[in-house]
Curated annotation (Swiss-Prot):
GO biological process: protein modification process
Native source species: Methanocaldococcus jannaschii (strain ATCC 43067 / DSM 2661 / JAL-1 / JCM 10045 / NBRC 100440) (Methanococcus jannaschii)
Keyword NAD: no
Similarity remark: Belongs to the RimK family. CofF subfamily.
Any one Pfam family match given in the protein's UniProt record, by short name: RimK
Temperature-activity note from the record: Thermostable.
Cellular component aspect of the GO annotation: cytoplasm
Cofactor(s) the protein requires to work: Mn(2+)
Job of this protein: Catalyzes the ATP-dependent addition of one alpha-linked L-glutamate molecule to coenzyme gamma-F420-2, producing alpha-F420-3, the major form of coenzyme F420 found in M.jannaschii. Thus, caps the gamma-polyglutamate tail of coenzyme F420 with a terminal alpha-linked glutamate. Prefers ATP to other purine nucleotide triphosphates; GTP gives about 25% of the activity observed with ATP. Cannot catalyze the addition of the following amino acids or analogs: D-glutamate, beta-glutamate, L-aspartate, L-glutamine, L-alpha-aminoadipate, or D,L-2-amino-4-phosphono-butyrate.
Keywords per UniProt: ATP-binding, Ligase, Manganese, Metal-binding, Nucleotide-binding
Binding residue positions for Mn(2+) 1: 245, 257
Binding site for ATP: 139, 173-186, 202
GO molecular function terms noted in the UniProt entry: ATP binding; coenzyme F420-2 alpha-glutamyl ligase activity; metal ion binding
Protein name listed in UniProt: Coenzyme gamma-F420-2:alpha-L-glutamate ligase
């Protein structure tokens, strides 16, 4: 019997437990390894006996501070020869929003104009260089779940939001207005092992549409253009499992973010068993 281990910071997400259930239905053993457990210690001789690791962790903000602990933990497991799906290079890419934007833009995928900034002066320089108007978006490059993402509507707000930018990995980004009839509706498409599983639109009165913030979903009809876009993103990021977040406008689709550990609640809400698709892929790779 193959064994798959899911790495999770605290195990609060229902997606983690739903995925474990689907893996076990396929006859594989599945453990959830909680990085927050007081019983665990990553020492020099620590080993994790498993056939495959699926990490729900990366570099990110937890409790308003940037932590590298989960990333160092993953790197230590790599030294032991552990196999990961998604690959570690994909985990790093999707954790770093700026690197991700750079890769997409280099490969002719439309993204909002974005800059990595050190301070307020960099932010002003960016606005002037691209002749942008307010509002603009300020976000932390390693933020999660829509947290630490803000809108600056004028220079005073911009100055406040760019304090300590160089220490916090802050980005400034062109604001893409994707509002429809007073509501913001972006898109999340899931790709698993080269197949588009499905997608939904996240509906919000705020430009931050993350489900973590309490927003709702509606089913997305995926046309050929969207399917090709999602598959290209998965190919570029070398991802087996990927959530592709897209801002739709009248004329274009803008890819805003890639997620290598996408939540599956939104898919369950529209009747798609994404956990089963992910579980099938993980079991295949664990057996290979």
């Amino acid at each position: 019997m193959v064994k798959i281990t899911i790495l999770s910071p605290e195990g609060r997400s229902c997606s983690v437990w739903s995925l474990k259930n689907e893996i076990e239905k396929l006859g594989a053993k599945c453990d959830i390894f909680l990085l927050s457990s007081p019983e665990n210690l990553m020492s020099h001789d620590f080993k994790l006996e498993t056939d495959l690791i699926h990490s729900r962790c990366g570099i990110g903000d937890y409790f308003d501070r940037l932590t590298l602990y989960s990333w160092q933990f993953i790197n230590a497991l790599e030294v032991e020869g552990c196999r990961f799906i998604n690959p570690i290079k994909t985990l790093y890419l999707t954790s770093d929003k700026f690197k991700c934007i750079k890769l997409l833009a280099k490969n002719k995928i439309k993204t909002p104009k974005t800059a990595l900034i050190r301070d307020y002066e960099d932010a002003v320089k960016f606005i002037e260089k691209y002749n942008l108007r307010f509002p603009v978006v300020i976000k932390n490059s390693f933020s999660k779940c829509g947290l630490k993402v803000f809108m600056a509507r004028n220079y005073d707000e911009l100055k406040q939001l760019t304090k300590n930018a160089i220490w916090e990995g802050k980005l400034i980004q062109e604001f893409i207005d994707f509002k429809e009839n007073d509501l913001y509706r972006d898109m999340r498409i899931l790709v698993v092992d080269g197949e588009v599983v499905g997608g939904y639109r996240r509906v919000s009165r705020d430009f931050r549409t993350n489900l973590y913030l309490g927003n709702v979903v509606e089913k997305l009809n995926i046309d050929e253009e969207l399917e090709e876009l999602a598959l290209k993103c998965a190919d570029l990021s070398e991802a087996v499992i990927l959530g592709v977040d897209i801002l739709p406008t009248k004329d274009n689709y803008y890819v805003i973010e890639l997620n290598s550990s996408p939540g599956t609640k939104g898919f369950r809400d529209i009747g798609i068993n994404a956990d089963k698709k992910i579980a099938e892929a993980l079991v295949r790779y664990a057996k290979s």
